[in-house]
Structures are given as C-alpha cells and as structure tokens.
Amino acid sequence: MNREDVEFPTCDGLILRGWLYPGTIRGPAIVMNQGFNTPKEILLPDVAVWFQQQGVTVLLYDNRCIGASDGEPRNDVKPAKLVEDFHDALTFMARHPMVDEDKIILYGYSFSAMTALVAAGLDHRVGAAISVTPIANYDFREKEKNNVMALAMQDRVSTLAGNDPVYIPFVGDDGYNPAGWGNQYNMEQFRAFLGTSFFTNRTTVQSYYHVLAWQPYGAMRLIKGTPVMMVTPAEDTISSPADQRAVFDMIPEPNKEFDLVAGRGHMDVINGEGAEEVLQRQLAFMRKHLDF
C-alpha cells in the first residue's frame, strides 16, 4: 500500500488535508470522504486501499473543521460547504498526473453520500457518483428540535458577544443524538470510535441549525448525464432503506443502479466479511460507465 499525505485549497481559503492512494497507471480516480463529524481514519481507509489495488487512484480527505483539515470552529458541519469542497477536491484530482480528468468518481458515505449526490448534480465534470448508505431523512424529534434551535439562537447572540461556540455531544450515552436527529446508534460499534485519538464526540450546536436548513432533495432532479449508484444496507437502522430508496427514485438520470445489500447495517456495509462482494459491484459499475 502506497499512501501520500496531500493537501488542497478551497475557494474560500481553507486547506483540506487527506491521503492519496495512487494507482499504478494514469486512469480513473475516486474522491472520497466520511460522514457527519467523522474523520477519515474511520472505516474508509480499507475501502480506499481496496480500490487502489484495483488500479484506481483514491483521494480520501477530512471534511472542513474535522481531523487534519482547516476550519473553525472545530467539529462544525455546514452541508452546503461540504458540497463546495467536493468540487474543489475534484479540481485538485483533475490536475494530478495519475488521473484521467474525465473519469473522476465522487464517493460519499453516510452524511457525505448525500453531499456527493448534490455535488454530482451541480458539477458536470463528475464522471459518476457512488452514494453509500446516505442519510436520507432530516427530520428532528419535535421536543429536541425546539430545544436545540433555541440553544442555537442563544449561541449566535453569545458568539456576537465574543464567546466561544456552544457544543453538544454527537451521540449521547443512550445512543441517540441529543438534538433529536435520526435513529439510535449501535453503542457497541460507536464505542470503538470513542476509544480512538482522532474522533471527537461533540459538534457545534450550529451544525444542527445548518442541517435543518439543508434541503438536498430538490437537487436530486439536477442529476442528469452522470451515472449514479446507491448502496443501501437492508438492515440500516440509522437511515431507513425506504428513505434511501425514495431519494434514489427522485434522480432522473437513467444510468442509475440501486444495490440493496442483504444482512448489512449502516456501519458494516462496506467493511468486514462479505464486503468485497459489495465493492466488486461498485467497481463493475465504474468500469461499465467510465470504460476502463
């Protein structure tokens, strides 16, 4: 495995950092990043290595405000900015000597699976998009939503007075997001992340303001001329398979594939025993539509 530390600029002046896994010859490339408040070290490096072994160059980078990438405040998530960063990551890869600029795939996992789709709808340089277990529902439980929005407005007032941003846990001890977003996490799996040095179990309260304002569904109709594959684990308890399928059905692009993976959940659909079969189908999709 050959891996390089790389960095690239965004249009608004940040530096995003990640790992480049160069292929053996000039050809296709994948631009890949992680989900909500999650650094690149979790789950995806093995996936990047697998694609590299198939001859595909891969960029796996930290989203802004996360991990090694720039951005303040830390652990602040702005979905619309993550879409823009996909464009700038693609620009970086298109200039790389190992990359065929007409064969660049956006690859998103979990939260970034939706930002990848929106980016693909807005950027016709994208050769194809692979959306793995997308977070497809942005509804919040009413009580928690009202509380967190009140706190977010208080935080804005406080920030203008010169105070530090307010943070809340990403996932509480009960496995639920305290802002009322989404379903319960498997705490046995989640605690494995908590024991690492690179994962921080907190997010700015403003992140949930931005998520509530994030309405990606309308952008699905913009995906035309870009092949799309959605990979949905049938046992996903974090993002409903029915919600994921509903998003898939919004996409007008005829060259689209829906891969419903039996017996897998949100956090093991592309990792662990049996995952190679899932990755092989993704590779076949890429080869079919990008001709390599």
Swiss-Prot record:
Disruption phenotype: Completely abolishes the production of fumagillin. InterPro entries: AB_hydrolase_fold, Hydrolase_4, Polyketide_trans_af380. It catalyses: fumagillol + dodecapentaneoyl-[polyketide synthase] = prefumagillin + holo-[polyketide synthase]. Pathway: Secondary metabolite biosynthesis; terpenoid biosynthesis. Its EC number is 2.3.1.-. Keywords: Transferase. PANTHER family: DLTD N-TERMINAL DOMAIN PROTEIN (AFU_ORTHOLOGUE AFUA_8G00380)-RELATED, SUPERFAMILY HYDROLASE, PUTATIVE (AFU_ORTHOLOGUE AFUA_2G16580)-RELATED. This is Polyketide transferase af380. It comes from Aspergillus fumigatus (strain ATCC MYA-4609 / CBS 101355 / FGSC A1100 / Af293). The lineage of its organism: Eukaryota, Fungi, Dikarya, Ascomycota, Pezizomycotina.
